[in-house]
Amino acid sequence: MKCRPTLNTDQPRVRKKLPERFPKWLQRPLPQGSAFHATDATIKRSGMPTVCEEALCPNRAECWSRKTATYLALGDVCTRSCGFCNIGHSKTPPALDPTEPERIALSAKELGLKHVVITMVARDDLEDGGAQGLVDIIQKLREELPQATTEVLASDFQGNVSALHTLLDSGITIYNHNVETVARLSPLVRHKATYARSMFMLEQAANYLPDLKIKSGIMVGLGEMEGEVKQTLQDLASIGVRIVTIGQYLRPSRKHLQVKSYVTPETFDYYRRVGEAMGLFVYAGPFVRSSFNADMILASVQDKASA
């Protein structure tokens, strides 16, 4: 019969130190205050979803403290289920809400937005991918906020160029479509979307309206190589994209894609310099997202153009 080893109860128990969930550069205080709560109240009154909330954006507190928000248009149910995204999905989302344009416009007016950013769920169930729904929002914004600039982060409309032209003809200030990741990882990261089709749609926009400010963005930390990021920047620059955002991918839940690496601030700065050498305006950093500080990015691009 084996004897059970005697525990030495005189020795203090040593608790192993667990690794930090995030590196130090991803740890920051969450600003809140009267402006944050005022923005929160305005959003709640409008009944409109924001990508800030639906996508669990880490910048929500900071943006709302500045009285800025990004509206999620065409409902809050997406027809795609990308591995990085927290937004709900279904093959049969609800019909478009005819009150949505007015609610977005009045909410933006109450916040006093000078630059309004609209993003959308993919609506592959609609013939035009929701393009006309976006136009209706832009038109209502123009009625309520005639001096405001507008930015739309659109889906790829399944490659429907006619739908793209419908959106571009609305007179938006910035057309944004994210390629999201490098070419090799696109099949893993994105659902029903391809790197080639995203590049095609961005190039079509640049050819259709050469003076339009065209923007795209990628996430890093998904397993990409440095050379692949540089190639993506080169691909974007070669087709007429002028603005690129680069941010750290953060896993919304255990059901989503794993983070492969935490990219250092120094590496983000390196990517910025690489992109700028290609003629791009690059906004890069751990917390950067497509719509983060979008008003400041536009102002910087305009200042650079007029210099």
UniProtKB/Swiss-Prot annotation:
GO terms for molecular function: 4 iron, 4 sulfur cluster binding; lipoate synthase activity; metal ion binding. Residues 64-281 form the Radical SAM core domain. Its cofactor is [4Fe-4S] cluster. Its EC number is 2.8.1.8. It catalyses: [[Fe-S] cluster scaffold protein carrying a second [4Fe-4S](2+) cluster] + N(6)-octanoyl-L-lysyl-[protein] + 2 oxidized [2Fe-2S]-[ferredoxin] + 2 S-adenosyl-L-methionine + 4 H(+) = [[Fe-S] cluster scaffold protein] + N(6)-[(R)-dihydrolipoyl]-L-lysyl-[protein] + 4 Fe(3+) + 2 hydrogen sulfide + 2 5'-deoxyadenosine + 2 L-methionine + 2 reduced [2Fe-2S]-[ferredoxin]. InterPro entries: Aldolase_TIM, Elp3/MiaA/NifB-like_rSAM, Lipoyl_synth, rSAM. Gene3D superfamilies: Aldolase class I. It is an enzyme of class 2 (transferase). CDD domains: Radical_SAM. Its main location: cytoplasm. [4Fe-4S] cluster 1 binds at C52, C57, C63, S291. Binds 2 [4Fe-4S] clusters per subunit. One cluster is coordinated with 3 cysteines and an exchangeable S-adenosyl-L-methionine. Pathway: Protein modification; protein lipoylation via endogenous pathway; protein N(6)-(lipoyl)lysine from octanoyl-[acyl-carrier-protein]: step 2/2. Pfam families: Radical_SAM. Disulfide bonds: none annotated. One of its GO terms (cellular component) is cytoplasm. It comes from the Bacteria. Keywords: 4Fe-4S, Cytoplasm, Iron, Iron-sulfur, Metal-binding, S-adenosyl-L-methionine, Transferase. It is found in: Cytoplasm. [4Fe-4S] cluster 2 binds at C78, C82, C85. NCBIfam families: lipA, PRK05481.1, PRK12928.1. Belongs to the radical SAM superfamily. Lipoyl synthase family. PANTHER family: LIPOYL SYNTHASE, LIPOYL SYNTHASE, MITOCHONDRIAL. This is Lipoyl synthase.
